[in-house]
Amino acid sequence: MKVVTGATDGIGRSYALDLARRGFNIFLISRTKSKLVKTKKQILNKYSDIEVRYAICDFTRVSYEDYKRLLHSLNEVDIGILINNVGMCFDNPEVLHRVEGGIDTLTNVINVNILPVTLLTAGILPQMMARKSGIIVNIGSAAGSIHMAKWSVYSATKKYIEWFTSILQKEYENEGIICQTITPLLVSTNMIKNPLSSIFCPNSDSFAKSSLNTIGNSSSTTGYITHQIQFELIKFVPEIIIDLFVKNLNNQLLDYQLDKKRV
């Protein structure tokens, strides 16, 4: 069984569909039952010879007991791949004390971006250790490698994922378990409020297919060739130029939001 969190939208949904295309049984985790039912139906309509299970979990409101119940359900099956995809960011770029929603939003971003990847990984590793086999894919972001003004907490939580996974690689390198970080740049999803795809901003289906093909080949990658090219080039760019790029990106996102409100 292959597990995907945040599995009913964007990259997570695309991961689930592409894993199903490859013939794997899927375990979907998301917060909205209607979307889970719809996604399960869509998968089975295309790939009727696989099994699809799901669990409802809102990671902004999840308790310790909720995590225990979720892990109990997950450990009832053999999990070959865990894709920790669920994530959350601010609605709009903003300096820390002016983030829309204030402390509630900041708490949600921290809870969603850090706790699931940590606790689900810890809860599923024992069965992988027993089999000496398993794959854990943690979806971060290039934002974790860049000091992005007006994305402070989001960027910092993505750095956590990168650091966390690199340590797991050291801890489990001789246990038959693959731990991989995916750090994409822009992907056309609802999270970035930009539906337009391009050579440098692929749609989620193209990204997921490319990313899955990197498992076993790279321990840390952007998951997509044009993203990797950009990421390697960024290493040679002075930070003042990167700051200007981030500022321009923030303005574009704000303009897009304003245009949507005018429609």
UniProtKB/Swiss-Prot annotation:
Matches recorded under Pfam families: adh_short
GO BP annotation list: fatty acid elongation; steroid biosynthetic process
PROSITE patterns attached to this UniProt entry: ADH_SHORT
Active site (record annotation): Y154
One MF annotation (Gene Ontology) recorded for this entry: oxidoreductase activity
GO cellular component terms, A-Z: endoplasmic reticulum
Record's keyword terms, sorted: Lipid biosynthesis, Lipid metabolism, NADP, Oxidoreductase, Steroid biosynthesis
E.C. no: 1.1.1.-
Family, per entry: Belongs to the short-chain dehydrogenases/reductases (SDR) family. 17-beta-HSD 3 subfamily.
PANTHER family in the record: STEROID DEHYDROGENASE 1-RELATED, VERY-LONG-CHAIN 3-OXOOACYL-COA REDUCTASE
Protein name: Putative steroid dehydrogenase 4
